Amino acid sequence: MASYNTTTANAMFKINYYKPSERLYNTADPLSGRLVNKNDFTGRSRNLPTYKSYSGGVGSGSKPVGNVASYEEAVLLRKKIYGTCEVDREAIKASENSAGAFVKATKEQVMKTVESYNRNKLRIILGNGGHATAARDSLLGNGNGSTQVSGAGTSGNPYVVVCGVDFKEASFEEKDFINYDAEVSLLEVTEVDAATKTIKLVGTSTGLASLSGSGPVPTTKYFYMQGSKGNDPFGFKAISDLVNGQTLYGVTVDRKWKMQVNDALGQGIIVDALNELLLQIEKKTGKVPNMIQCSYTQYVKVLNLLEDQKQYNLPAKDSRFKASVSFSGVEFMSTKGPIPLFYNRFVEEDRIYAFNDNYIEIHHAPGFGWFDDDGTIFMRKSNGDDAYEATYGGYWNMYAQPTFHGCIKNLAI
């Protein structure tokens, strides 16, 4: 005779549902919240005069000849940056009370879409002007091309792309939809392996199909967030890579309109290198950066380097006090006092950035946020689906005066 147990009498036992687990992804953003946001960007463009030299002739012994300063005009154009979510109407109705679901479908999607948008915004601010990553034929220590492609893009045989040395794990999340080069077809990220710098993709791609099993991704080909090729604002990776003669916001890059970039040539980070970077920026502008951001890799090295300057802010468990506790980090002592140093998952492994957030502005058109012009944020989809769609975001661009910021690149990893 069988005993009465959870198997033989399965229908009589309830399922004990507990609260959802903590999110298993990193949403920390120690940069965006410190930037200046302006929500009055109307008109076709925003033009900002730049002063690149002194004005007025000076001299002794006789009256000097006057001169006019060197002026240029920075031109800022808005970019369309979106986050969207879709919710099936049945799911909305099925989640209207706690007996039907852990959370309301609309509330869950609203929260997760804002999280995803903020992640993409941070990627843009620190990015290279569009690329999700340069999965390309980068050179490794052995001098051979690193990127290889295999697979067929199906769920059972996904494209497997081994990325180059500038791979950033944070650029990809499972379930992301991305484009390869200029293709409009969507590729779903199904797996990310940071250790091997490998991503797996499911979807249709003529370009990847032609490369599968035959060779690396060309140096001119990249992956992009959906529709982002040529449409992202310039980020700090792109700004730091500019050379004299190129332009940023329409202003010619030269010694007065250029980020201070020091090449470590494969050496490890040392205090002298940080001091040199900060003093070079102060020498040019009279201002010292007020924030340093680096990759996790460099942060580990900095923790060992600044053993006597470590300072941690441990957040209180009690929510009543959390607002009074700042983001945890390390302080680096500059000529103008301590500067907070944070790790940022969107910084390249071999880089450290020094920012002055007083000279980084996000210029928004009015009405940034959820698109609710029709009185509601959830609109019925027009393609016949029994579903609703909501859009978050707006029209903005970042204006960073490059001379007030700096970077150390090619640090030992």
Question: What positions do the PLM features span?
Answer:
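Core alpha/beta structural scaffold of self-assembling particle/tube/pore-forming proteins
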Residues: 1-52, 73-413
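N-terminal low-complexity, intrinsically disordered segments
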Residues: 49-71
